[in-house]
């Protein structure tokens, strides 16, 4: 049933297992992705568990459904309570759908039937869940003495009728992580579409922001625009922080008034067919920058982002771009009199710039907004000392880590520099060794700004890069705000 070429299992000379499943006859009709791993096997059974239906605690109301991303990556199925097996030796992909439940069908509508699943998904077999236990038992009886059953987690062991299964719960997860780090054409299209909808929503906010009075209105309009354009789900909780709230990296309360605030940091991205976008724009609550300080910080972050984006290409180490961003930030903050008393390199090595730019420069984007990827087993000796001053591990995601591989064609990464003036961070910095490099009196004048972050999703291409994010920024952003006044 599955299409030829990429949908077949291929075991190469290096024992790479490539599994690509075509999503046919549905709204995507594309490959959802592939799994590549040096499993070193020609037989075995891959077993994946989809997201079950779960109620809220102490409630009869179900939680919103969100498919497990590893399951979706291999199957393309966005239905609850499904299972998937792949018999490597026999090249047999089987989807298990929920058994028919009359009570549920009356209340909620029927679940996916075998016939519907066959028409929608290009798999070899579709069976009801009642067959799952017996099918796995038969596979185990025939093959499990010499072949393993591969699962993602120890908590996802299948039930069988008898006997202990020979399982492996260590190899499949890193194999899928490595595959997900490189996006194919279908995945790039999904991320591009998510960005298209996000750009529409960001633009709509800019057109109307001067008529708004609360952060909640910003969040509401963004959601309304996304849903009305077919993107029901957000890739993450919307961050609409005004004033000092813009200095809170993951501020999601979005419940304060806008009056008297200078800027809004809007970090919001739609999801499209389970694929994320991640977009941040910072804009004034006026037709122009309300203060020279706000303008200067925006232009500094703009420079940080532009200089880093122009250097993205395959073979680049992403952490080197983070170093560059910190160097540009330090130079700019020294010009503004916020950093002082040392050379750029001395200040960078001290870690003082992390008070103002505490997070990583970016991360992978895909089925998760902070997507997974392959990791090097060891970092190059000496790296840790060089990068440690500008790297806060708890606030950094791959590829902004020592274990990250070099950028490769097909990776999608964010570039999201920011400069923040957090009361808490500044108060804590007074107690640290690098305090001598910070002019606290000057820095505290910038606290009303909160923070500025600009974030785009960048595809690494064969010849360099492509910016997938089209949300307005810079002068175009200001022009839209101004036109909104007159409309």
UniProtKB/Swiss-Prot annotation:
GO terms for biological process: proteolysis. The keyword Transcription does not apply. Binds 2 manganese ions per subunit. Mn(2+) 2 binds at residues 267, 278, 455. It catalyses: Release of any N-terminal amino acid, including proline, that is linked to proline, even from a dipeptide or tripeptide. Its cofactor is Mn(2+). It is an enzyme of class 3 (hydrolase). PROSITE patterns: PROLINE_PEPTIDASE. Its EC number is 3.4.11.9. It comes from the Eukaryota. Keywords: Aminopeptidase, Hydrolase, Manganese, Metal-binding, Metalloprotease, Protease. It holds the Pfam family Peptidase_M24. One of its GO terms (molecular function) is peptidase activity. Mn(2+) 1 binds at residues 278, 416, 455. PANTHER family: XAA-PRO AMINOPEPTIDASE 3, XAA-PRO AMINOPEPTIDASE AN0832-RELATED. Belongs to the peptidase M24B family. Catalyzes the removal of a penultimate prolyl residue from the N-termini of peptides. This is Probable Xaa-Pro aminopeptidase AFUA_1G14920.
